[in-house]
């Protein structure tokens, strides 16, 4: 059978990873799920005009991630650590084809900026002003 780009050397399977790489992959995936949840909540608040502490925490989390990506010059700053732990595969490449994985950061950044703009441009509803 011919090798595909996804079968490229260096793509470690779960069984091939050491305990530190497995733990890091789990933590990294969990943090990614939290970030995607924050992004979803920002959009929920934009659409419903809701304002609360969870929105503030979600925005702070997304801004933290934006800062980390800025430090990493568009790549996850954990990449070198992940490689040193024996896991050379970027997280997005575990679930997306390589080309889509490369596009994920700019696409998610655009969605996040649009969500934050929507929150800022749509005034809060009266009900959410009392939720603080």
Go through each PLM region and give its residues.
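Short amphipathic, positively biased membrane-proximal segments
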Residues: 1-132
């Amino acid at each position: 059978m011919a090798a595909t780009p996804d079968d490229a050397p260096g793509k470690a399977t779960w069984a091939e990873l050491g305990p530190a790489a497995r733990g890091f992959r789990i933590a990294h995936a969990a943090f990614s799920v939290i970030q995607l949840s924050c992004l979803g909540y920002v959009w929920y608040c934009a659409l419903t005009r809701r304002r609360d502490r969870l929105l503030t925490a979600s925005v702070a989390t997304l801004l933290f991630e934006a800062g980390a990506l800025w430090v990493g010059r568009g790549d996850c700053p954990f990449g070198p650590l992940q490689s040193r732990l024996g896991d050379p595969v970027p997280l997005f490449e575990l679930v997306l084809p390589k080309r889509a994985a490369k596009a994920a950061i700019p696409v998610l950044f655009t969605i996040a900026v649009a969500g934050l703009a929507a929150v800022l441009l749509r005034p809060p509803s009266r009900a959410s002003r009392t939720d603080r």
